Amino acid sequence: MMINPTSDPTTDHPYRTAPPPRTFDPDSSRVPYDGQTRMRLTIPSGLAHACVVIDPAARDLLAIECGDGPRPRIRLAGGELALTWRHLFGDWLRDVFTPGLGDVAIVLHPAVEWTVAFRGGLSRVELDLSAGTVARIDIAGGCSHVLLDLPPPAAVVPIRISGGASHLGIRRPAETGVGLGVAGGIAMLRLDDRSLDAIGGAAQLDTGDVTRGVPHYELTIAGGASDLSIERR
């Protein structure tokens, strides 16, 4: 799913604590980029059949393509962006019985350090964040059939998943380590060249290249994990 970036010359500005001066329609599909350096994106109602990508060619702070599906309402306040879908029962039936109708693409600006937070869970979602900078990732409500492509970390970056994870794939730069903590047991874990069938209870593992104080990812899963893969890109 392609989104053509809009032309919007950018200038260097410090991180803003007040809304950018440009106005935008909260029912539109784009938010102009205005020099922001850090943003938090929150999707409070869950997400399915979607991709979220940091695009090196993006000119907007955020752009959304929903095909024929319902569009979210955008809320922008200082360093906070929130996307809210107003689902009606008829929309839900249409999405269920029409394959591909609910596919969503969310494109983010590459010059921003992003914190992303999902509530309500993720299902069949691709998060390609490899071309940007990420400060934190939070997923509440569990996730299933999710692929997460990570950029080089600038610090120790937490990834928190509550509600369990199944069919979760994580790719990171070859030189980047990942620490893993799981509460609730693991079934079918692939950690680079290592494979484990099952671990009961709580587990603490890492990729073998995690050093205290050196930038890496810290993945914590509450609620158990099944078919979890962590590999180098």
Question: What annotation goes with each model-predicted range?
Answer:
Residues P26-Y33, V52-A57, L62-G100, L147-R233:
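Short, surface-exposed interaction patches in beta-rich subdomains
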Residues H109-E113, R119-L122, D128-C143, P151-V156, ...:
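Extended beta-solenoid/beta-helix repeat architectures
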Residues L41-I43:
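Short acidic/polar, Gly/Pro-enriched loop/turn segments located at secondary-structure boundaries
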Residues G102-I106:
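Short, charged beta->alpha transition segments
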Residues A48-V52, R119-D128, R160-H167:
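Charged, low-complexity, helix/coiled-coil-prone segments
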Residues R38, L47, L101, E113-T115, ...:
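Surface-exposed or flexible loop/turn and strand-edge residues in extracellular/cell-surface modules
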Residues M1-R30:
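Gly/Pro-rich, low-complexity intrinsically disordered segments
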